[in-house]
């Protein structure tokens, strides 16, 4: 049931906050904080296959393997809402991955679905063009 006490502006702000916290935790290598930004099971569609994490156990480790040895940090280039309800926001996202020297490894587009489940906002799934 949709909670009309939450405005679309509040839902969008909550979803953007989730992404900001996700990237901060990712860059800090903080697996606990990173897990707080995700609902589990968590789904990622990329490279023609769906990856599913039932629990947060290997999420950071799996990311580091995907990003490669040259990865140092990532930044959000933009995160734009494309659809919204009081309990779910779809975001058009572009992020960049960088080496330690500041050179760009790549820029990638993705769609993130951030949802409020059991009164907690977190990313439920995404479709990404990143490796």
Residue ranges with predicted function:
Residues 31-80:
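A solvent-exposed, acidic/Ser-Thr-rich amphipathic alpha-helical stretch
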Residues 38-39, 95-97, 127:
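Short beta-strand segments enriched in hydrophobic/aromatic residues
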Residues 76-82, 94-97, 109-115:
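Hydrophobic/aromatic beta-strand elements that line small-molecule binding cavities or substrate pockets
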Residues 83-87:
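Residue-level recognition of beta-strand termini and adjacent short loop/turns
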